[in-house]
Amino acid sequence: MATITREQIGSLHDKITVQMVKEDYVPGFEKAMKGYAKTVQVPGFRKGMVPAGMVKKMYGPSIFNEEIIRTASKELETYLQKENLAIFAQPLMMPNESNYQLDMNNPQDVSFSFEVGLKPTFDIKPIQDKAKLTRYSIEVADTMIADELVRLQRRYGKAEPQETVVNADDIIYATYHKCDATGAVVDANAKQEDTVLFDKLPKGMQTLLMGKKAEDTFTIVPNQVCGADELTAFLKDPLKTTETDAATTYQVTLTKVARLIPRDLDETLYAEVFPNAAITTLDAFKEKLKEELGKEFVRISKERLTNEMYELLVHQTKLDLPVAFLKRWMKEGQEKVRTDEEVEAEFGSFDHQLRWTLISDKLIVENKIQVNLDDVKNSLKAQVMSYFGMGADDEAPWMDGYMDKIMKDEKTIDETYRKMLFDRLFEYLETQFTIQDKKVSEEEFFKLQDPHATHHHH
């Protein structure tokens, strides 16, 4: 029977040695050889009739090696289960640790050494201390409602053809061709097309376009028509290029001009924006806009609070990790072998995510946070009904068949399950912190420091 010893070689980092006498693995090797001889196919021999000596000579060394490794791995697995060791990933064979020569004709006592990374035990101090967090309530200002009215009037407006570019509400349809040093078009077929509101163009382009008619052609140089704060965006879209073409000449053809005629604020617009709400007055429309903007702000605020809790737990929960083992596992223990430089570059984000996995797993288990298959199905059904604009009382004969099809999609089920599980985890966490409510304006909210930067101290 194998002898197993364990010694600490670092923080949460142990070396486990499996020592085997030949009697531990030779019977398994002989059994494997007999089984292989029954199935191996060699030209000139019937299946199962290949001489044992030939099979051993041809395939014995590889089967011998496999059986020794298999036996050692099985002994190690049994030991880990018996000792109830919680380890990261899987054991890694120690480099340059072999002290034997594998020879099937001369079996010897052998030993293998593995290194393992142990999962830490830890307390979640931010929860124990009822750490303080802020939940922000973003106010929907009257100016926001006014801006939203203008945006919707323009969005649902119509474009009327015009002869000449004359104001900021004009819609510009244009094509761009790159030119060579002489000003000639490089490739007539290589063009970029763009449709944009006049007032969204760089100021220099606006000056050139004013008064132009459809089919007019002129040339521009991006860094001459763009300010420093406009250049990068203009090169990216519409020109689909980079800073290397900042001084390149482009031929611009104004293919069409149209005028954006904003929609009137009336019942037809209200019905298009909110088809399921019977809105007849401007005041009611404004109230509905305020309600919808409020919902979006609640979502954004909740998302920030979730990020705050996540970052606080990751950065303020003290837990040790077997860094040396984890880096070696990242380098050698996966399908993709990484360089030392790649490991160092990726370790920060890996460490961050691993800490969250340990913390969230502990919280989910200890607080019995669960999601069952019916929960997943009901959530997906609600999403389907929302997508089709259905109410709870609406009948849909096709729904059962549609849901059966969705419930066979393992990826969708897994994604929904994980989202619901973590939603419930964060709902629970909201009850475990000291949360203060604070009203802020939209501008104040978006000036707040990023949660990661706030809590990142290690």
Segment roles from a protein language model:
Residues 64, 70-122:
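Extended, domain-scale alpha-helical bundle/helix-rich regions
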Residues 117-157:
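Internal alpha/beta scaffold segment
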Residues 2-71, 78-79, 178, 211, ...:
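Extended, charged alpha-helical "arm"/coiled-coil substrate-binding scaffolds
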Residues 110, 172, 218-220, 248:
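Generic structural signal for buried aliphatic residues
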Residues 87-99, 149-169, 409:
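Phosphate-interacting basic helix/loop segments used at nucleotide- and nucleic-acid interfaces
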Residues 32, 149, 160-212, 221-222, ...:
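Core FKBP-type peptidyl-prolyl cis-trans isomerase
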